[in-house]
Amino acid sequence: MHLFIEVIAAFFTALSFGVLFNMKGKNLILAGIGGSIAWFSYKFLLNMGVTENLCFFIATVCFAIYCELCARIYMTPATTLSVCCLIILVPGYGIYNTMYSVLTNNYIKAVEYGVSTLSCASSIALGLVFITTVFRKVNLY
């Protein structure tokens, strides 16, 4: 039940960012579904015991494939969908902990949090670049 509530919250978060980016109609729903896919993939894998970086990578691959397919089916830019889905996975808590540790002069913890956050962000970037490159090189028509 807890995962279901988180997935619904991810849907509305992605949908809200779609509103912020002036998306309209069915694109808002597509963005919300993509955010739900991203968060469900991440949390499901995390609960299965997969490492956090791999969870971020696989969740990014899942929503990036979804966004690329929706972009081709509904003739909409994949970038706008991807950005709305990407917001869900941004490691904000790690960034907060890094800055908090710096401000409290706990530099060893700051480096630990910073490296962890940077590796999570890198996993997200690699997943998105990987799928985008594959879809640009492979012609589905």
Positions of PLM-derived features:
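Alpha-helical transmembrane segments and their membrane-interface boundaries
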Residues: M1-R72, T76-A78, N97-Y141
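Membrane-helix boundary/juxtamembrane motif in polytopic membrane proteins
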Residues: P77-C85
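Hydrophobic alpha-helical membrane segments
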Residues: C84-N97
